[in-house]
Regions:
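A ligand-binding cleft/hinge motif common to bilobed small-molecule-binding domains
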Residues: 157-166, 290-302
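Short, structured coil segments at secondary-structure junctions
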Residues: 102, 167-170, 255, 315
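Extracytoplasmic substrate-binding proteins
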Residues: 139, 145, 149-239, 262-263, ...
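A short, structured surface patch at a secondary-structure boundary
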Residues: 52, 63-144, 150-152
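Sec-dependent bacterial lipoprotein signal peptides
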Residues: 1-15
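Flexible, glycine-rich surface segments
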Residues: 211, 216-300
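Proline-aspartate-enriched helix->loop->beta-strand connector
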Residues: 129-134, 139-156, 169, 273-287
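Bacterial Sec-exported substrate-binding components of ABC uptake systems
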Residues: 17-94, 201-230, 315, 328, ...
Length: 366
């Protein structure tokens, strides 16, 4: 009898351990990697039980869950994660998926006109990724065929999202383009990571970006001489001037230079040539980003606007240039602000980088 009772006790203990183990395993499977947001201002994260609450801007709220049966709090749109299929609307969004090695999740994009990424182009060619059309002209049937779990949208674009809403697909705003801090924009890889189950990978990748960026920023902060820099060029009678409260102006500051509109509190505005010249005539450097067909040159810059030769930076051959026809700027730069920063530091303060450094985006115009 004692032996029998002993056997029962052992059996009960084993069952209890097994049940506890199952609970722990289930808890581990359902748990979400912690996400900390340090620089980005466009989204915030709160974890509650088995629900992750993600607020995007002031109007959009999402409850990320592993179990479809989980009830989302009032005011939150439930999204079962990890998602397996999505559509990207911008190169910035696509850059997040690229750096996370998650092209398999992307089932649709707007188009391939200015696309550089060979893997994405191959997927479009063989049908794994479809082209849904440009903003305002989306093809609802193609969107439905892509069968996305969610669609990441950019409110800055022309829209056309109402037709997609009617299909019943969850639209998730991606506000990375609004970030004023370069690291804040890059941190949106954590946002995408939460939706595709790559929180850990996103955190590790971002930590590397952050470390490299801040290390170089600290070196540049110690320079004794800070050159001045202006940005942009004339288009259709106006010069779109980046404001002092802007992503690019912040990069200039972090690279050890002073932007000519450093005290402005706007992100950007269109100015007449005369006003921009008054601000920029004596700037040491002049940054230009465009999509010139062919090899851009000082001759081409003068041909586009004869008065350009009046700038000090033009005369001294200190124009900093990137051609988007030749460089996948918007496909890479949003998630590599550390590289972008290094390009500028290499020009402003070459002694702070290795002598054989080869720029990725910007270089002095020849």
């Amino acid at each position: 009898m004692k032996k029998f009772l002993g056997f029962i006790a052992v059996l009960v203990l084993l069952c209890a351990c097994s049940t506890q183990g199952d609970k722990q395993a289930k808890s581990g499977a359902d748990s979400m990697e912690e996400v900390t947001v340090k620089y980005a201002t466009g989204f915030s994260v709160r974890d509650s039980a088995d629900i992750r609450l993600v607020d995007v801007g002031k109007k959009d709220h999402f409850a990320l869950v592993h179990d479809e049966a989980t009830v989302a709090p009032e005011g939150y749109v439930k999204v079962k994660v990890p998602i397996e299929r999505t559509i990207c609307m911008t190169s910035l969004q696509l850059s997040n998926f690229t750096i996370l090695d998650a092209h398999d999740v992307v089932k649709g994009i707007t188009g391939t006109k200015n696309l550089f990424n060979e893997d994405i182009k191959a997927r479009v060619k063989d049908g794994r990724i479809v082209k849904i059309g440009m903003e305002g002209e989306f093809d609802p049937e193609v969107v439905m065929a892509a069968n996305p779990d969610v669609i990441f949208i950019s409110p800055s674009k022309r829209g056309g999202y109402d037709a997609i809403k009617e299909i019943g697909i969850t639209l998730v705003p991606h506000l990375g383009y609004k970030e004023l801090d370069p690291l804040g924009q890059a941190e949106w890889i954590k946002f995408i990571g939460m939706f595709i189950g790559k929180e850990k990978e996103a955190a590790e990748i971002f930590a590397g970006i952050e470390s490299r960026y801040n290390e170089l920023k600290e070196k540049a902060a110690k320079v004794e001489q800070r050159p001045t820099v202006t940005s942009g060029e004339m288009h259709y009678g106006n010069w779109h001037a980046v404001g002092g409260k802007n992503y690019l102006a912040q990069i200039f500051r972090d690279a050890g230079a002073d932007y000519v509109i450093n005290d402005d509190e706007t992100s950007g505005e269109d100015l007449e040539f005369e006003k921009m010249y008054a601000l920029s005539a004596n700037a040491d450097y002049w940054r230009i980003l465009n999509s010139y067909q062919g090899d851009f040159s000082y001759e081409a810059l003068k041909a586009s606007e004869p008065r350009n030769e009046m700038f000090k930076a033009f005369k001294e051959k200190k124009v900093i240039y990137c051609n988007m026809k030749q460089t996948p700027y918007y496909e890479i730069a949003p998630v590599k602000p550390d590289v972008l920063l290094k390009d500028f530091v290499a020009i402003f303060h070459p002694e702070l980088v290795e002598k054989d450094y080869q720029p990725t985006f910007y270089r002095l115009l020849q």
